[in-house]
């Protein structure tokens, strides 16, 4: 994830464009997203995404970063979760796999679209492009185990010290791309209702087991 800044490689026009968009997002963020401008390096865009309600990530605060390359916006930025998460489309090093940041990228999509796509990835994981094969396999074959594992990782690594209201699961806000499912189909959507009734009695035991992950 580490790397030098690419600010010197970007044109003044692109620098102004990115700076303006980041400032606009910081002042008028999408629901469930907070953007933190980095005045020293605008190619390092950091944000926090609230875990959407009705998912195993509910109540979590997930820090992410977008690293803009020297050819941005002709090439997509790289996205990373800085907060540990159990998710099919997030690698162990935090790298995010979503088609919007790969084959479906378009130079005019903008940072807001990327952030909303990543948020919707928490609602609709895509096991077909899994970077975490274990999570993808569990999502498809043993959803209850997947949900419990993801929920406990959220509890350990993403829960803030002070509780905040969970973000509403607003499906209509999800960008329509092939990298995310934007309908109520799929294994994740079908199980949302049961996620809120997780067994609390196993929580302490699972926490101890997962702290070494």
From Swiss-Prot:
Region (Disordered): 157-213
EC number from the UniProt entry: 2.3.2.23
One function term, GO molecular function aspect: ATP binding
Active site: 97 (glycyl thioester intermediate)
Pathway listed: Protein modification; protein ubiquitination
GO biological process: anaphase-promoting complex-dependent catabolic process; cell division; exit from mitosis; free ubiquitin chain polymerization; positive regulation of ubiquitin protein ligase activity; protein K11-linked ubiquitination; protein polyubiquitination; ubiquitin-dependent protein catabolic process
Name this polypeptide is given: Ubiquitin-conjugating enzyme E2 S
Organism phylogeny: Eukaryota, Metazoa, Chordata, Cephalochordata, Leptocardii
């Amino acid at each position: 994830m580490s790397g030098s800044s690419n600010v010197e490689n970007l044109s003044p026009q692109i620098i102004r464009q990115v700076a303006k968009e980041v400032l606009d997002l910081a002042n008028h963020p999408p629901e469930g997203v907070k953007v933190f401008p980095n005045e020293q390096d605008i190619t390092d865009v950091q944000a926090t995404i609230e875990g959407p309600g009705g998912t195993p990530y509910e109540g979590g605060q997930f820090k992410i970063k977008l690293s803009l390359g020297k050819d941005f916006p002709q090439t997509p930025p790289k996205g990373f979760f800085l907060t540990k998460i159990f998710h099919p489309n997030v690698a162990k090093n935090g790298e995010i796999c979503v088609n919007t940041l790969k084959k479906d990228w378009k130079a005019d999509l903008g940072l807001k679209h990327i952030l909303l796509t990543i948020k919707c990835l928490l609602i609709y994981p895509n096991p077909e492009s899994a970077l975490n094969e274990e999570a993808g396999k569990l999502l498809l074959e043993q959803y209850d185990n997947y949900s419990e594992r993801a929920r406990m990782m959220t509890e350990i690594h993403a829960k803030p010290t002070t509780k905040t209201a969970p973000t509403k699961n607003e499906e209509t806000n999800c960008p329509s791309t092939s990298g995310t499912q934007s309908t109520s189909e799929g294994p994740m959507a079908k199980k949302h209702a049961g996620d809120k009734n997780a067994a609390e009695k196993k929580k302490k035991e699972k926490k101890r087991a997962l702290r070494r992950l």
